UniProtKB/Swiss-Prot annotation:
Keywords: Transferase. Homodimer. The lineage of its organism: Eukaryota, Fungi, Dikarya, Ascomycota, Saccharomycotina. Gene3D superfamilies: 1.20.1050.10, Glutaredoxin. It comes from Saccharomyces cerevisiae (strain ATCC 204508 / S288c) (Baker's yeast). This is Glutathione S-transferase 2. Changing residue 129 to A: Reduced enzyme activity.
C-alpha cells in the first residue's frame, strides 16, 4: 500500500496502522526487523528514525523513555504504543496481515521456530555482540564505559561453537527451523553479519553453514538489507 502505514486485521476488519522504527541502518539487531519487514513487503511503508549509537544517543533520557533497555530497534505505533526486542517486533509485524509466515502457523511450528530463534540468540548473535562490546573498541571509549576483554574472548569462542552447532543443524535440513524460511533463519543471518563486522570468520569446516549463508545472501530481503548496510557504512 502507499504511504506510511499498513493494513492490519482486527476481527476481520481492515485498519490502517502507522509505524515508526527507531534503529541504526548498519546494526545487526535492527537487521532482523528490516529483513522481516522486507519478507512481509512492508519495508517501504515504515518511517525509520536513525539512532546514532556511536554518539550514545541510545543512552540519552529521551530514548530511554521509549526503551528502558537502551537498545535498538524500537517500534512505535500511532497510538503511542512502544514495542522493543526483535522477536516481539517480528511477532507483531508477522501477524498484521493475518497470514504469519516467519513465526509459525501451527503450535508445533511456533514451538520449533521459537526454540531455534532463542538458540540463535544465545549461541551466536548475543555472544558476537558481547565480543564486540568487550574485546574490541566497540562503539568507542565514550560509549563503552566498562569492558572485560577476557569475558569478550570467551564469548567469541562461544560464538564459534554456535557456528558449528548451526552447521550440524543445516546438514540435516534446508532452514534453521525446518523446511521453510523463518525468524530463526533471520537471527542466524544477523549473527553472521555481526561476525563479519568483527572479522570473526565462519570456520572452513562449517560447509553447510557457509553454503546456507551464501544462499541466504541471494534472498531478496537479505540483499536489500546488505544494500542498506553498504550505503550507511
Amino acid at each position: 500500500m502507499n504511504g506510511r502505514g499498513f493494513l492490519i486485521y482486527n476481527g476481520g476488519e481492515k485498519m490502517k496502522q502507522k509505524m515508526i522504527i527507531y534503529d541504526t541502518p548498519a546494526g545487526p539487531y535492527p537487521a532482523r526487523v528490516r529483513i522481516a519487514l522486507a519478507e512481509k513487503n512492508m519495508l517501504s511503508s515504515v518511517q525509520f528514525v536513525r539512532i546514532n549509537l556511536w554518539k550514545g544517543e541510545h543512552k540519552k533520557p529521551e530514548f530511554l523513555a521509549k526503551n528502558y533497555s537502551g537498545t535498538v530497534p524500537v517500534l512505535e505505533l500511532d497510538d503511542g504504543t512502544l514495542i522493543a526486542e526483535c522477536t516481539a517486533i517480528t511477532e507483531y509485524i508477522d501477524a498484521l496481515d493475518g497470514t504469519p509466515t516467519l513465526t509459525g502457523k501451527t503450535p508445533l511450528e511456533k514451538g520449533v521456530i521459537h526454540m531455534m530463534n532463542k538458540r540463535a540468540e544465545l549461541e551466536l548473535l548475543d555472544p558476537v555482540s558481547v565480543y564486540f562490546h568487550h574485546a574490541t573498541p566497540g562503539l568507542g571509549p565514550e560509549v563503552e564505559l566498562y569492558q572485560n576483554k577476557e569475558w569478550g574472548l570467551r564469548q567469541r569462542d562461544k560464538a564459534l561453537h554456535g557456528m558449528h552447532y548451526f552447521d550440524t543443524v543445516l546438514r540435516e535440513r534446508p532452514y534453521v527451523a525446518g523446511d521453510s524460511f523463518s525468524m530463526a533463519d533471520i537471527t542466524v543471518i544477523a549473527g553472521l553479519i555481526f561476525a563479519a563486522i568483527v572479522k570473526l570468520q565462519v570456520p572452513e569446516e562449517c560447509e553447510a553453514l557457509r553454503a546456507w549463508y551464501k544462499r541466504m545472501q541471494q534472498r531478496p530481503s537479505v540483499k536489500k538489507l546488505l544494500e542498506i548496510r553498504s550505503k550507511s557504512s
